[in-house]
Amino acid sequence: MAFNVTILSIFPEMFPGFLNYSLAGKALEKKIWNLEVINIRSFAKDKHSTVDDVPYGGGAGMVMRSDVVGDAVDSMLSVHKNTKFIYMTPSGTKFNQNIARELLEFPHITILCGRFEGIDQRIIDAYTPYELSIGDYILSGGEPAAMVVLDACIRLLPGVVNNTDSITEESFNYGGGVLEYPQYTRPEQWKGYKVPEVLLSGNHKKISDWRQKQSHVITKKRRPELLSGEINDKFT
């Protein structure tokens, strides 16, 4: 069964963007995943296709209108009644590999991409989307964040990555969720740097032990919370 995605955006022309290339692009051609993009501006109430307005209470920036966004959401829900509805926002749960895997369990997902200062809170109150963030920084809109989420999901779909070991041995999958070990390829020596001898030994047990140790060392140094389990890694 294909992975089906609907995007709600005021810039539909941004999609599929970089998802039209490499693994994701080939998977889109093969219909391993399907993309539908809905233009929120199509639901605007005036001839200028206005989707935003000044915030009540004052403040900087503009806010996406609840009536316009709500009509776009209602239109989507009339077709995709069982979709998993997601809103990309910096204040959401931080996205990770486990969430990417769990998203694939849904037959259809919808991602709402915000702009300006975000969407009217009443959209969140009325539709209770799952609020998702890709990190502690601000983008100009939710579209790039949505593409990041989709890229992480798509490469996990059967038939996208030919060598499944590439997935099971990478960061956040390898060794119970730690960072990946260092990788080396030809030439054997470069600018005085040599490939570790153990990787040239042909001893698979020693190579495996070395990789596990390196993963643990790197994770402890850069992301110790992954070892302590102090992260929210569930899609709830």
UniProtKB/Swiss-Prot annotation:
Localization annotation: Cytoplasm
Gene Ontology cellular-component annotations: cytosol
Catalysed reaction, written as an equation: guanosine(37) in tRNA + S-adenosyl-L-methionine = N(1)-methylguanosine(37) in tRNA + S-adenosyl-L-homocysteine + H(+)
Enzyme Commission (EC) number: 2.1.1.228
Keyword terms, alphabetized: Cytoplasm, Methyltransferase, S-adenosyl-L-methionine, Transferase, tRNA processing
GO molecular function: tRNA (guanine(37)-N1)-methyltransferase activity
Role of this protein: Specifically methylates guanosine-37 in various tRNAs.
Assembly description: Homodimer.
Name of the featured protein: tRNA (guanine-N(1)-)-methyltransferase
Species per Swiss-Prot/TrEMBL record: Wolbachia pipientis wMel
Gene of this entry: trmD
